[in-house]
């Protein structure tokens, strides 16, 4: 009789797990329905994209009530379908006077999150496709010339495309015509960053545990193949992300599965040891880093341990602060382009969180504590699967594009009533003291 009892117990456990899975799916679907009502724009892509970035330019067609922004996207298709590097035009309505008809009783405001009388005018169209070998792990434009695009491939190569030398729609010959191939990595990677201080230079990180630097200006006239100008072997495990310091032109940061944040000084010839090494800040792999563009010493790190670390580079023996609010690995980070203390993070928990570091340490009422720490400003829960990437729009404050493994590209904006500053907010330059 004992085996039968054991079988019954196993069936009960399976039923409980099935019920939990069903409840989880129902919760995800309900959240999605809510956000679908409130998001300015949701579009189902034919294939998911692992990468998204707003271009820096914006056009204002004469006589139109919208502006045209552009997005850089990729594809992640099945093996049978070709992959593309893609550019999309996004029509965003111009700011219009508040319409009393848009008053929302529940929020007590006109319009609000993603609400506008011109929402229907938002439109997203793919305007150029460039054939790509396999999925696009990451794509980024060169800041000095946004027509020059770099992509990370599944075989470890980095491809450089000049989009002006490619048709808007390829003939699907299966032939990839990149202008330059950067060869050196021995495995795929997701770390890619252009040098904001010097045109034609970029850094990359890979599963081969190396960080490599490249200088397109050294390419020989009769060649399409470029080798790295320098290879760093200061990490012991996968290098997940790399970034040039936006202020100090000689520093490059990298993070790794070895749970360290490391900063190299390119003025030094040493390639096996970093100038700055931050250890013991996380309990699992570090997936991303982001230097604060308004503070020379502040940097954030995102980890698989579900937390975000805030560091002062003058003393990396311990973190300045830890941001806690995600329920799964944190995979992406980006500071707001104009608000000095605002940090965005994306996670496998399907959420994007905006953090306001000026509110660190603020006192909370007991009821408010249930909503998270005081610095948790806003949480976007509209995706139904893991977040792949997100990007702040540099021209429209608080406008964000986000992409997830659910094939959805979302373009959304937070209501001003949510992100308004308080008089008692801490200045960003006081956080790093």
UniProtKB/Swiss-Prot annotation:
Matching Pfam families: CAF1C_H4-bd (PF12265), WD40 (PF00400)
Name of the protein in its database record: Histone acetyltransferase type B subunit 2
Source organism, top-level taxon: Eukaryota
Main location: cytoplasm
InterPro entries registered for this protein in UniProt: G-protein_beta_WD-40_rep, Histone-bd_RBBP4-like_N, WD40/YVTN_repeat-like_dom_sf, WD40_repeat_CS, WD40_repeat_dom_sf, WD40_rpt, WD_repeat_RBAP46/RBAP48/MSI1
Quaternary structure and partners: Component of the HAT-B complex composed of at least HAT1 and HAT2. The HAT-B complex binds to histone H4 tail.
GO terms for cellular component: cytoplasm; nucleus
Location relative to the cell: Cytoplasm; Nucleus
Biological role stated in the UniProt entry: Regulatory subunit of the histone acetylase B (HAT-B) complex. The complex acetylates 'Lys-12' of histone H4 which is required for telomeric silencing.
């Amino acid at each position: 009789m004992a085996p039968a009892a054991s079988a019954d117990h196993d069936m009960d456990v399976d039923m409980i797990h099935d019920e939990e899975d069903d409840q989880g799916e129902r919760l995800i679907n309900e959240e999605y329905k809510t956000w679908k009502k409130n998001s300015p724009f949701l579009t189902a892509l034919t294939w998911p994209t692992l990468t998204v970035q707003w271009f820096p330019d914006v056009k204002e067609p004469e006589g139109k009530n919208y502006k045209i922004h552009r997005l850089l996207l990729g594809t992640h298709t099945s093996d049978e379908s070709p992959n593309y590097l893609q550019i999309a035009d996004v029509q965003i309505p111009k700011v219009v006077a508040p319409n009393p008809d848009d008053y929302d009783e529940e929020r007590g405001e006109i319009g609000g999150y993603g609400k506008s009388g011109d929402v229907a005018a938002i439109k997203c169209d793919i305007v150029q496709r460039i054939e790509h070998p396999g999925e696009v792990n990451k794509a980024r434009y060169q800041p000095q010339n946004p027509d020059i695009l770099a992509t990370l491939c599944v075989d470890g190569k980095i491809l450089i495309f000049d989009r002006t030398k490619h048709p808007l729609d390829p003939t699907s010959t299966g032939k990839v015509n990149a202008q330059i191939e950067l060869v050196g990595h021995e495995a795929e990677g997701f770390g890619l960053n252009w040098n904001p201080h010097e045109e034609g230079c970029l850094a990359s990180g890979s599963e081969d545990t190396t960080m490599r630097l490249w200088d397109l200006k050294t390419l020989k006239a009769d060649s399409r193949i470029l080798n790295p100008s320098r290879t760093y072997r200061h990490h012991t495990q996968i290098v997940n992300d790399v970034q040039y310091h936006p202020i100090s032109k000689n520093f490059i940061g990298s993070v790794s599965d070895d749970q360290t944040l490391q900063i190299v000084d390119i003025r030094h010839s040493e390639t096996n040891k970093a100038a700055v090494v931050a250890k013991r800040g996380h309990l699992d792999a570090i997936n991303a880093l982001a230097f604060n563009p308004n503070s020379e010493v502040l940097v954030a790190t995102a980890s698989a341990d579900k937390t975000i670390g805030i560091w002062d580079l003058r003393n990396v023996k311990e973190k300045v602060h830890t941001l806690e609010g995600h329920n799964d690995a944190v995979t992406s980070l980006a500071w707001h382009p104009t608000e000095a203390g605002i940090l965005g993070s994306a996670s496998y928990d399907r959420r994007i969180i905006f953090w306001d570091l000026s509110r660190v340490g603020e006192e909370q009422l007991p009821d408010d504590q249930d909503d998270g720490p005081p610095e948790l400003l806003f949480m976007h829960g509209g995706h139904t699967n893991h977040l792949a990437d997100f990007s702040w729009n540099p021209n429209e404050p608080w406008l964000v594009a986000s992409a997830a493994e659910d094939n959805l590209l979302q373009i959304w904006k937070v209501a001003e009533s949510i992100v308004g500053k308080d008089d008692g907010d801490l200045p960003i330059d006081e956080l790093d003291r």
